[in-house]
Amino acid sequence: VVPSAPGKRFSNDTKVTDMLYACYDLADQGKSFKAELDAIKARYQEIIDGLQLDLDLSEEFGIIEKNFKAKSGNNYAASRGEYLNGIIMANYLGYDIIDAATVIFFDENGEFDAAKTNEVLRARLAESKEAVVPGFYGSMPDGTVKTFSRGGSDITGSIVAKAAHVDVYENWTDVSGFLIADPRIIDNPKLSLIHIS
């Protein structure tokens, strides 16, 4: 499973990725970003509570705060949306979490390294029966986080599908939950989740 960061909950809402960019911009300027980080924490807590999970992201948010203060960069900041959502999804499904930075690679020029990624990702996926790999990011040769362009979780999904040798890759986006039809075509499609594997 390859999740994106949480998107808009309603029309005038803000995507978590945009919240993270704004939060990091303040940190990068040496300004207080506590209120912005607290809003992001609340957003994830709402998801955790909605799923009735016994999950605490305090440690992860502590690391994020420290790295923002250390000016870890926009790529790192933006990637945390997928990373945190991946932790939640893995907890909810009972799957392993595989940090994309350990299995998705870019070369020294910032270009996607398909050969290295496929080799490492295939081996890592073989160690897990079921896994969640957060979308949108990977790592540079020096270990720093690098993101794909906006919408990069779709790219990650196809990369993971190739490495896993799946027969079918399904890309579900822009809806809250799992629906039986595209809500842009069918008004109020029924939420339907009977089985996921």
Residue positions per predicted region:
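Nucleotide/pyrophosphate-binding catalytic subdomain
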Residues: 1-197
